[in-house]
Amino acid sequence: MKWTDDDNFMRGAVPMTKAEVRILTVAALELVPGQRFLDIGAGTGSISVAAAASGCTVDACECHPEALGLIVENAKAFDVSIDILAGKAPDVLSETAYDRIFIGGSKGRLDDILGYCHGHLTSGGIVCGNFVTPANAVRFREFLKARGYLWTFRYIAVSREDRFGMLRAENGVFMVKGQKP
């Protein structure tokens, strides 16, 4: 089963990083087997599954009860191991150091999460966040700039053909990436 295909994931009512954005996110994270990976606001676990399938040791943080169940189901379906941290970040996060961190949701606690990420990301490590609001994307970029990270800021817009042959736009996503000095 491929993690690049949305139809392979259990979703329910939980938002999921769509295939095109997931592929670009995984590329931006530059995953290497053996790395420690943290997924904050893991949702359905689609990014966690991709990281685990790439050979990373994965911790997925999520507070929504339905999403927690979907992460378990998706990990099982893809035959990967994901350690689940149930609750809000950064409250339930450990003192573990991570090589790669993905922020998929912040529940209004972006500043606290960014502080945690900065303190627990290894030197040379990559943190990447996908945001639907420009305000959070800009806050993340400014955080990275102020701390000397190498950073990129992108807006990703995807359209898909519908059954009538017309292109229908998906919601756009701001992708911000930083590499710690």
Predicted features, each with a name:
Residues M1-P33, G69-E73:
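Class I SAM-dependent transferase core
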Residues L29-L31, A52, H120-L121:
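A generic alpha-to-beta junction signature in SAM-dependent methyltransferases
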Residues Y116-F174:
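C-terminal substrate-binding/active-site "lid" region of AdoMet-derived donor-dependent transferases
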Residues G108-Y116:
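A short, conserved alpha-helix within the catalytic core of class I
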Residues T44-C56:
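Conserved SAM-binding loop of SAM-dependent methyltransferases across substrates and taxa
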Residues C61-T96, R100:
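S-adenosyl-L-methionine
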Residues G43, E66, A135:
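Conserved Rossmann-like nucleotide-cofactor binding loop
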Residues G34-G43:
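Conserved class I S-adenosyl-L-methionine
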